[in-house]
């Protein structure tokens, strides 16, 4: 198989299980399997080093990018309210949190040169 959709992998009463499921998603991506974790409010995917992915707006409003391995370099986001160009994201400074689609944009494009990203898309409140 080339894609996996994990339902029931987010939320719940045990945060450590959610974190473990994020790690599982990264492990699948490292093996060439496209991983998506989804619940009723959020969808989580990954952008691997050297990869560019497009995120159509659909029903999502908020868009966040976090370095899954502690640091990501050469991060670019286009089509977002706060665009990034050759940025460095670190776990200690969450620069990529709570972004939005730019006015008139129906897609955000994300790439990373080094370090995997976890992408969180969330519906508006």
Regions found by a protein language model. Give the residues of each.
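Anionic-ligand-binding alpha/beta catalytic cores of soluble enzymes and soluble regulatory domains
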Residues: 3-54
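Long, charged alpha-helical interface segments
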Residues: 42, 47-125
């Amino acid at each position: 198989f080339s894609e996996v959709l994990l339902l029931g992998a987010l939320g719940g009463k045990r945060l450590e299980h959610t974190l473990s499921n994020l790690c599982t998603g990264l492990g699948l991506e490292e093996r060439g399997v496209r991983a998506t974790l989804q619940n009723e409010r959020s969808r989580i995917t990954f952008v691997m080093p050297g990869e560019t992915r497009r995120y159509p707006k659909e029903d999502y409003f908020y868009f966040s990018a976090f370095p899954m391995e502690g640091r990501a370099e050469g991060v670019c986001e286009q089509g977002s309210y706060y665009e990034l160009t050759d940025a460095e994201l670190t776990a200690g400074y969450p620069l990529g949190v709570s972004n939005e689609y730019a006015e008139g944009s129906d897609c955000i494009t994300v790439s990373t040169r080094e370090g995997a990203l976890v992408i969180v898309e969330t519906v508006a409140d």
